[in-house]
Protein backbone atom coordinates (compact mmCIF):
# COMPACT_ATOMS: atom_id res chain seq x y z
CA UNK A 1 0.00 0.00 0.00
CA UNK A 2 1.58 3.27 -1.13
CA UNK A 3 2.21 5.85 1.58
CA UNK A 4 4.02 9.14 1.69
CA UNK A 5 6.71 9.09 4.35
CA UNK A 6 7.30 11.91 6.76
CA UNK A 7 10.73 12.37 5.23
CA UNK A 8 9.22 12.92 1.78
CA UNK A 9 6.98 15.69 3.02
CA UNK A 10 9.89 17.45 4.66
CA UNK A 11 12.16 17.13 1.69
CA UNK A 12 13.49 20.27 0.05
CA UNK A 13 16.29 22.61 0.93
CA UNK A 14 13.96 25.56 1.54
CA UNK A 15 11.98 23.79 4.24
CA UNK A 16 15.10 22.56 5.98
CA UNK A 17 16.51 26.06 5.88
CA UNK A 18 13.35 27.53 7.38
CA UNK A 19 13.29 24.93 10.12
CA UNK A 20 16.86 25.74 10.99
CA UNK A 21 16.12 29.45 11.15
CA UNK A 22 13.03 29.08 13.25
CA UNK A 23 14.55 26.53 15.58
CA UNK A 24 11.09 25.71 16.82
CA UNK A 25 10.80 22.17 15.56
CA UNK A 26 8.46 20.66 13.01
CA UNK A 27 5.23 21.98 14.47
CA UNK A 28 6.18 25.58 13.76
CA UNK A 29 5.61 25.02 10.05
CA UNK A 30 2.66 22.71 10.53
CA UNK A 31 4.39 19.31 10.63
CA UNK A 32 3.13 17.78 13.91
CA UNK A 33 4.43 14.35 14.94
CA UNK A 34 3.23 11.68 17.33
CA UNK A 35 5.03 8.62 18.69
CA UNK A 36 3.71 5.57 20.51
CA UNK A 37 4.25 1.84 20.91
CA UNK A 38 1.60 -0.69 20.05
CA UNK A 39 1.48 -4.36 20.98
CA UNK A 40 -0.23 -6.89 18.75
CA UNK A 41 -1.21 -10.13 20.49
CA UNK A 42 -2.30 -13.23 18.58
CA UNK A 43 -4.44 -15.67 20.55
CA UNK A 44 -5.04 -19.23 19.36
CA UNK A 45 -6.96 -22.21 20.75
CA UNK A 46 -5.19 -25.56 20.42
CA UNK A 47 -5.67 -29.14 21.65
CA UNK A 48 -3.05 -28.45 24.33
CA UNK A 49 -4.74 -25.26 25.52
CA UNK A 50 -4.71 -21.57 24.63
CA UNK A 51 -1.53 -20.13 23.17
CA UNK A 52 -0.53 -16.55 22.46
CA UNK A 53 2.38 -14.42 21.34
CA UNK A 54 2.93 -10.68 21.03
CA UNK A 55 5.17 -8.14 19.39
CA UNK A 56 5.65 -4.44 20.21
CA UNK A 57 6.13 -1.91 17.42
CA UNK A 58 7.28 1.70 17.66
CA UNK A 59 5.08 3.95 15.54
CA UNK A 60 5.87 7.43 14.26
CA UNK A 61 3.10 9.39 12.54
CA UNK A 62 2.97 12.91 11.19
CA UNK A 63 0.70 15.12 9.16
CA UNK A 64 1.68 17.70 6.59
CA UNK A 65 0.04 21.09 6.00
CA UNK A 66 -2.03 21.61 2.88
CA UNK A 67 0.42 24.19 1.55
CA UNK A 68 3.09 21.53 0.98
CA UNK A 69 3.47 20.71 -2.73
CA UNK A 70 2.62 17.22 -3.92
CA UNK A 71 0.02 14.53 -3.41
CA UNK A 72 0.89 14.11 0.28
CA UNK A 73 -0.29 17.61 1.21
CA UNK A 74 -2.66 17.58 4.16
CA UNK A 75 -2.32 13.83 4.64
CA UNK A 76 -1.06 11.46 7.31
CA UNK A 77 2.14 9.45 7.00
CA UNK A 78 3.31 6.76 9.39
CA UNK A 79 6.20 4.35 9.74
CA UNK A 80 6.93 1.52 12.15
CA UNK A 81 9.93 -0.13 13.76
CA UNK A 82 9.83 -3.67 15.11
CA UNK A 83 8.99 -7.14 13.93
CA UNK A 84 6.20 -9.56 13.15
CA UNK A 85 4.55 -11.83 15.71
CA UNK A 86 5.79 -15.43 15.82
CA UNK A 87 3.56 -17.93 17.63
CA UNK A 88 4.82 -21.50 17.97
CA UNK A 89 1.95 -23.98 17.95
CA UNK A 90 4.07 -27.14 17.84
CA UNK A 91 7.71 -27.98 17.10
CA UNK A 92 8.37 -26.73 13.58
CA UNK A 93 4.91 -25.17 13.31
CA UNK A 94 4.90 -21.40 13.72
CA UNK A 95 2.19 -18.90 12.87
CA UNK A 96 3.45 -15.47 11.76
CA UNK A 97 1.43 -12.25 11.76
CA UNK A 98 3.39 -10.12 9.30
CA UNK A 99 4.01 -6.39 9.03
CA UNK A 100 1.75 -6.18 6.00
CA UNK A 101 -2.04 -6.22 5.69
CA UNK A 102 -4.00 -9.30 4.72
CA UNK A 103 -5.71 -9.27 1.30
CA UNK A 104 -8.60 -6.83 1.47
CA UNK A 105 -7.37 -5.35 4.76
CA UNK A 106 -6.16 -1.79 5.24
CA UNK A 107 -4.10 0.35 7.60
CA UNK A 108 -2.00 -2.44 9.17
CA UNK A 109 0.43 -1.94 10.81
CA UNK A 110 1.21 1.77 10.66
CA UNK A 111 -2.24 3.40 10.90
CA UNK A 112 -4.22 0.59 12.51
CA UNK A 113 -4.35 2.27 15.94
CA UNK A 114 -6.09 5.30 14.46
CA UNK A 115 -8.97 3.09 13.38
CA UNK A 116 -9.06 0.47 16.13
CA UNK A 117 -9.10 2.92 19.04
CA UNK A 118 -11.37 5.49 17.36
CA UNK A 119 -13.78 3.43 15.24
CA UNK A 120 -16.62 5.95 15.46
CA UNK A 121 -14.35 8.93 14.80
CA UNK A 122 -15.34 10.58 18.09
CA UNK A 123 -12.08 12.47 17.72
CA UNK A 124 -12.47 13.73 14.20
CA UNK A 125 -8.99 14.98 13.35
CA UNK A 126 -5.77 13.03 12.99
CA UNK A 127 -4.17 15.56 15.33
CA UNK A 128 -6.63 14.78 18.13
CA UNK A 129 -6.25 11.04 17.68
CA UNK A 130 -2.46 11.27 17.44
CA UNK A 131 -2.32 13.20 20.70
CA UNK A 132 -4.49 10.64 22.47
CA UNK A 133 -2.39 7.73 21.23
CA UNK A 134 0.87 9.41 22.22
CA UNK A 135 -0.06 10.74 25.64
CA UNK A 136 -3.22 9.32 27.10
CA UNK A 137 -4.18 5.80 26.00
CA UNK A 138 -2.28 3.13 27.96
CA UNK A 139 -3.28 -0.41 28.82
CA UNK A 140 -6.52 -0.35 26.86
CA UNK A 141 -6.92 -3.47 24.72
CA UNK A 142 -8.98 -3.48 21.53
CA UNK A 143 -9.78 -6.41 19.27
CA UNK A 144 -8.81 -6.03 15.63
CA UNK A 145 -11.72 -6.25 13.19
CA UNK A 146 -11.20 -8.55 10.23
CA UNK A 147 -10.64 -5.65 7.83
CA UNK A 148 -7.59 -4.58 9.86
CA UNK A 149 -5.86 -7.99 10.03
CA UNK A 150 -2.22 -8.53 9.15
CA UNK A 151 -1.25 -11.22 6.68
CA UNK A 152 -0.91 -14.60 8.41
CA UNK A 153 1.63 -17.08 7.06
CA UNK A 154 3.63 -20.14 8.04
CA UNK A 155 6.47 -22.22 6.58
CA UNK A 156 6.35 -25.95 5.96
CA UNK A 157 10.13 -25.84 6.52
CA UNK A 158 11.34 -22.99 8.74
CA UNK A 159 14.81 -23.18 7.18
CA UNK A 160 13.48 -22.71 3.64
CA UNK A 161 11.89 -19.31 2.84
CA UNK A 162 10.34 -20.67 -0.36
CA UNK A 163 8.01 -22.92 1.66
CA UNK A 164 5.98 -19.93 2.90
CA UNK A 165 2.22 -20.23 2.59
CA UNK A 166 -0.79 -18.16 3.57
CA UNK A 167 -2.81 -19.19 6.61
CA UNK A 168 -6.58 -18.68 6.49
CA UNK A 169 -7.58 -16.89 9.72
CA UNK A 170 -10.98 -18.55 9.51
CA UNK A 171 -9.50 -22.05 9.21
CA UNK A 172 -6.20 -22.53 11.06
CA UNK A 173 -7.03 -26.23 11.36
CA UNK A 174 -6.45 -26.65 7.63
CA UNK A 175 -2.81 -25.70 8.20
CA UNK A 176 -2.05 -26.74 11.77
CA UNK A 177 -4.43 -29.64 12.35
CA UNK A 178 -7.73 -30.32 14.15
CA UNK A 179 -8.55 -28.26 17.20
CA UNK A 180 -6.46 -25.23 16.23
CA UNK A 181 -8.39 -22.00 15.71
CA UNK A 182 -7.75 -18.29 15.85
CA UNK A 183 -9.45 -16.72 18.86
CA UNK A 184 -8.61 -13.08 18.37
CA UNK A 185 -6.01 -10.48 17.53
CA UNK A 186 -5.74 -7.55 19.92
CA UNK A 187 -3.95 -4.21 19.91
CA UNK A 188 -2.72 -2.33 22.97
CA UNK A 189 -0.90 0.98 23.38
CA UNK A 190 1.99 0.24 25.71
CA UNK A 191 5.24 1.49 27.23
CA UNK A 192 6.90 -1.92 26.77
CA UNK A 193 10.15 -2.01 24.77
CA UNK A 194 10.10 -2.67 21.06
CA UNK A 195 10.42 -6.37 20.25
CA UNK A 196 13.78 -7.32 18.77
CA UNK A 197 15.51 -10.55 17.82
CA UNK A 198 12.65 -13.01 18.13
CA UNK A 199 11.92 -13.40 14.42
CA UNK A 200 15.56 -13.94 13.46
CA UNK A 201 15.89 -16.58 16.16
CA UNK A 202 13.14 -18.54 14.40
CA UNK A 203 13.94 -17.63 10.78
CA UNK A 204 17.72 -17.50 10.69
CA UNK A 205 17.82 -16.83 6.94
CA UNK A 206 16.41 -13.33 7.56
CA UNK A 207 19.94 -12.31 8.60
CA UNK A 208 21.31 -12.99 5.12
CA UNK A 209 18.41 -12.41 2.73
CA UNK A 210 19.16 -8.71 2.32
CA UNK A 211 16.71 -6.78 0.15
CA UNK A 212 15.72 -9.69 -2.06
CA UNK A 213 12.49 -11.63 -2.24
CA UNK A 214 11.94 -14.86 -0.30
CA UNK A 215 12.24 -16.91 -3.50
CA UNK A 216 15.76 -15.59 -4.15
CA UNK A 217 14.84 -13.14 -6.89
CA UNK A 218 15.86 -9.50 -6.65
CA UNK A 219 12.48 -8.16 -7.79
CA UNK A 220 8.83 -9.16 -7.74
CA UNK A 221 7.54 -10.49 -11.06
CA UNK A 222 4.32 -12.01 -12.37
CA UNK A 223 6.46 -14.71 -13.97
CA UNK A 224 7.52 -16.16 -10.62
CA UNK A 225 6.39 -19.74 -10.00
CA UNK A 226 5.90 -19.08 -6.30
CA UNK A 227 4.07 -15.75 -6.23
CA UNK A 228 3.82 -15.52 -2.44
CA UNK A 229 7.54 -16.11 -1.88
CA UNK A 230 8.21 -13.63 -4.68
CA UNK A 231 6.00 -10.97 -3.06
CA UNK A 232 7.48 -11.12 0.44
CA UNK A 233 10.75 -9.59 1.63
CA UNK A 234 12.59 -9.04 4.90
CA UNK A 235 10.59 -5.86 5.62
CA UNK A 236 7.41 -7.92 5.90
CA UNK A 237 9.04 -9.54 8.96
CA UNK A 238 11.38 -6.86 10.36
CA UNK A 239 11.54 -3.08 9.99
List where the protein language model places each region.
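Bacterial N-terminal signal peptides that target proteins for export
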Residues: 1-13
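Bacterial N-terminal signal peptides
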Residues: 12-21
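Sterically constrained small-residue positions within well-ordered secondary structures
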Residues: 29-31, 78
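Alpha-helical transmembrane signal-anchor/signal-peptide segments
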Residues: 31-46
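Structured domain cores in non-transmembrane regions
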Residues: 48-164
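Glycine-rich, aromatic-bearing surface loops/beta-hairpins
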Residues: 156-239
Amino acid sequence: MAAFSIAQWRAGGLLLFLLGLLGGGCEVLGFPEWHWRQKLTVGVASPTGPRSASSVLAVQCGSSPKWVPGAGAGGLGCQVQGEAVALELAPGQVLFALLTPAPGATNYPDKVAYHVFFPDRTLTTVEERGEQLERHIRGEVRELPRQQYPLLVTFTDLTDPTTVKVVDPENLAATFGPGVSLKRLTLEITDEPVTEGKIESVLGWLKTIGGGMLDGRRISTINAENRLANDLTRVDFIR
